[in-house]
Curated annotation (Swiss-Prot):
Keywords: Lipid droplet, Membrane, Transmembrane, Transmembrane helix. It is found in: Lipid droplet; Membrane. The lineage of its organism: Eukaryota, Viridiplantae, Streptophyta, Embryophyta, Tracheophyta. GO terms for cellular component: membrane; monolayer-surrounded lipid storage body. Belongs to the oleosin family. This is Oleosin 18.5 kDa.
Length: 173
């Protein structure tokens, strides 16, 4: 009932534009002529589906036939020329790989040299603080190792002298 007060979808769009929608279609089907309408619609759907499916089936079969023909023609050529083509392809792949890697290593080297230059001139590039702290840690560890070596060296040589004194100064070999 509320639809009649505000108007239906058909009243807003206009009945002339879509004559077989909503209540009109329901009345048409109830009059007995609607079964013909739905059957013709089903036939149209089926015809469209058969046409689309058939054309796709034809296209896929043409693609398959084209692929088989291309392989039939290309396989003997590939077999005949494989002693030439395979080494040539390997050579080309190695050349491309070599040029790309040398270019990448060159860019990396330029970047490293630029960073070292900035660091040496005192510009403090990114990461230099980490390098300085690592250098300080390494220096302190090296100093600790040197001190321990001197301590154990003195202890070791001092220990032999103590043993020699207890034996009366005689060295045994």
């Amino acid at each position: 009932m509320a639809d009649t007060a505000r108007g239906t979808h058909h009243d807003i769009i206009g009945r002339d534009q879509y004559p077989m929608m909503g209540r009109d279609r329901d009345q048409y089907q109830m009059s007995g002529r609607g079964s013909d309408y739905s059957k013709s619609r089903q036939i149209a759907k089926a015809a469209t589906a058969v046409t689309a499916g058939g054309s796709l089936l034809v296209l896929s079969s043409l693609t398959l036939v084209g692929t088989v023909i291309a392989l039939t023609v290309a396989t003997p050529l590939l077999v005949i020329f494989s002693p030439i083509l395979v080494p040539a392809l390997i050579t080309v792949a190695l050349l491309i790989t070599g040029f790309l890697s040398s270019g990448g290593f060159g860019i990396a080297a330029i970047t490293v040299f630029s960073w070292i230059y900035k660091y040496a001139t005192g510009e403090h590039p990114q990461g230099s603080d980490k390098l300085d702290s690592a250098r300080m840690k390494l220096g302190s560890k090296a100093q600790d190792l040197k001190d321990r070596a001197q301590y154990y060296g003195q202890q070791h040589t001092g220990g032999e002298h103590d043993r020699d004194r207890t034996r009366g100064g005689q060295h045994t070999t």
